[in-house]
Amino acid sequence: MTDTPDPAAVLSPAVKAAVLSEALPYIRRFHGKTIVVKYGGNAMTEERLQRSFAHDVVLLKLVGLNPVVVHGGGPQIDDALRRIGKQGTFVQGMRVTDAETMEVVEWVLGGQVQQDIVMMINEVGGKAVGLTGKDGMLIQATKKLMVNKDDPSQPLDIGFVGDITRVEPAVVKALQDDQFIPVISPIGYGEDGTAYNINADVVAGKMAEVLGAEKLLMMTNTPGVLDKGGKLLRSLSAQTIDELFADGTISGGMLPKISSSLDAAKNGVNSVHIVDGRVPHCLLLEILTDQGVGTMISSH
């Protein structure tokens, strides 16, 4: 892999000073506030973007914000499944998860991916701690049944996929109080201890609601939400989102992302953004500068 230099490294001192000056009012405004970040896409697989993400998260913590990371891991799960001869399948953006797939999901998300993120943040000066839904009873869930579009009276069983029934945020708040950065794997647990695979966008949205987050940022592999002509939509209201769902503009993996974002906006999260995770330092650009890098979701 070619080690592409970080664009920030080639900025002149004057430009860097201007950037810091522009950030100051945002640092004041968001000091002490919780920022939930759904980390996924290319930003998880390209070394240059991994580094910029880790630096962004640590810098946000150092200047007084409280970042909480909820991570995905779809490509890593797909790779692990291929190694055992399985092919991933999806229904309405949700991964069909049989018992064998669930074992892989737990190992990949709660082990490999989570620990890589924790180590990456710690290596650049942060103090990250990994969690799954089982830790502190963080994410309680029940089996999810999907609506069958062909026959709504017959719900679709997609295996060990969960709906969140409760988020108990005490463990996250305790970590924040001790200046740690929580890194959460999207695995929930039922009352009987059954593990459930939960879409990371859904977990991020619910976590933002329960923590009373100031911002929710969903990282993706596109500039934001695009219309059918490929043009970036800078802002979306609830009414516009309904129209985009109806005409098929929003589909596939973007469905749970937009639905969770809208739910968070309706339930008290002040600012919800779909951001381009392929842009280095996209978190700093979205949070600490005048110019955003994606689509803003509003509840009205």
UniProtKB/Swiss-Prot annotation:
Entries under CDD domains matching the protein: AAK_NAGK-C
Pathway(s) served: Amino-acid biosynthesis; L-arginine biosynthesis; N(2)-acetyl-L-ornithine from L-glutamate: step 2/4
Pfam families: AA_kinase
Annotated Gene Ontology cellular component terms: cytoplasm
Transmembrane annotation, as ranges: none
Cell compartment(s), UniProt: Cytoplasm
Site (Transition state stabilizer): 38, 257
UniProt keyword list: Amino-acid biosynthesis, Arginine biosynthesis, ATP-binding, Cytoplasm, Kinase, Nucleotide-binding, Transferase
Domain of life: Bacteria
EC nos: 2.7.2.8
GO MF entries: acetylglutamate kinase activity; ATP binding
Residues reported to bind substrate: 73-74, 95, 197
Catalysed reactions, semicolon-separated: N-acetyl-L-glutamate + ATP = N-acetyl-L-glutamyl 5-phosphate + ADP
Any single biological process term in GO: arginine biosynthetic process via ornithine
Keyword Cytoplasm in record: yes
Family that this chain belongs to: Belongs to the acetylglutamate kinase family. ArgB subfamily.
Role noted for this protein: Catalyzes the ATP-dependent phosphorylation of N-acetyl-L-glutamate.
Name by which UniProt lists this protein: Acetylglutamate kinase
Organism encoding this protein: Bordetella bronchiseptica (strain ATCC BAA-588 / NCTC 13252 / RB50)
Gene: argB
